[in-house]
Regions:
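N-terminal secretory/membrane targeting signals
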Residues: 1-14
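Multi-pass membrane glycosyltransferase architecture that uses lipid-linked
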Residues: 9, 18-328
Length: 328
């Protein structure tokens, strides 16, 4: 069987719930019900693993440098095998080793997808200011007016949380709907309704108190391309969340190609163990790791002397997040 065929089988829908691989890492798989894999126990294991990877990894680097200085270099094959092991462990720890008990039940992050899927798909209509207002108006038209009027909303024009009854949502719904063609408004309401049904309660109501849709225009171009491939839904969002996994794998492959396994292990362990960007904060997302992939690509392409491609990758990463520009 070819690699392409294996990937096709792995990503084939399972009971209309998305890629088959996601069933393996979902709470529906009885494997994850074992006591050592439950959240409290697993989080303790992850903390220990992160500390061990960083401390032991640092010790091994110093040991190798010391051995080389003494004229007793570590065998290349052994160093490579240890580096591969640390790369695998570092990569896995970022994803909590795909244990569903420590993250979002269906892998993808609904709060994230509400903002970036809807925001990019309907950017022409909602722009940077109208996502929350249009969401509330859609809910009113879907028959939930009494409930909507009781909520608060962040007014993105002034960055203040206000009662919905004091905003344009109730006073002038056309402030939003005038930007939509009828078929696009119907599609928007359908997508909003899916989010409401899948994330009802305080979780849903608090989404419109966040800080709105905020990616730069370059990200919006890519996000809109993928978002318009399907309606809001469990299976489709799992496919979109898969993009970041592929970007992670691609970045690791580039590091191996350009720098070898030892440098790759250092980079992957650092990325996998840093608390500021752990999976709970950045995982299960929609194209959140694109800037990182292109930044890594720029460094690797520079190492291999593909300067034009490296410049393009660094430019794209900078357009996505601005701060990679410090590497120019």
């Amino acid at each position: 069987m070819t690699l392409a065929a294996l990937l096709a089988d792995a990503l084939a829908p399972s009971d209309d719930k998305g890629p088959w691989l996601f069933w393996l890492i979902s709470g529906k798989n009885e494997f994850w019900q074992m006591k050592p894999l439950q959240k409290e126990n697993w989080e303790m294991f992850l903390r220990g693993t992160r500390v061990a990877l960083t401390m032991i990894g640092a010790a091994l680097i110093m040991y190798k440098a010391r051995a080389f200085k003494l004229g007793q270099p570590v065998p290349q094959k052994l160093a490579r095998n240890v580096a591969i092991l640390f790369t695998l462990l570092g990569f896995g720890v970022y994803f909590d080793y795909f244990n569903p008990n420590t993250r979002y039940s269906e892998y993808y992050h609904r709060h994230e997808f509400y903002h970036y899927y809807l925001g990019s798909k309907y950017f022409q209509e909602v722009g940077y200011k109208r996502l929350y207002e249009c969401t509330a108006i859609a809910e009113i038209e879907l028959g939930r007016a009494a409930n909507v009027r009781k909520r608060d909303i962040r007014d993105l024009r002034v960055n203040l949380i206000k009662p919905i009854i004091d905003t344009e949502v109730v006073k002038d719904p056309k402030h939003c709907t005038a930007h939509f063609k009828p078929e696009r408004w119907s599609a928007f309401k359908k997508d909003v309704d899916w989010f409401y049904k899948s994330a009802a309660g305080n979780y849903w109501e608090n989404m419109i108190k966040d800080h709105g849709y905020n990616p730069p225009p370059v990200w919006t171009m890519t996000g809109k391309f993928f978002a318009n491939m399907g309606d809001a839904g469990d299976a489709f969002f799992k496919y979109l969340a898969s993009i970041d996994i592929l970007l992670h794998l691609g970045a690791v492959a580039l590091l191996v190609w350009a720098f070898g396994w030892e440098t790759t292990a250092v980079g992957v362990v650092f990325w996998g163990c840093n608390k500021a960007a752990d999976f709970y904060w950045t995982g299960g997302a929609f194209l959140r790791q694109d800037w990182w992939f292109f930044l890594v690509a720029a460094l690797c392409l520079t190492k291999k002397k593909y300067f034009f491609l490296a410049g393009f990758a660094l430019m794209w990463s900078t357009l996505l997040r601005i701060f990679p520009g410090i590497f120019f």
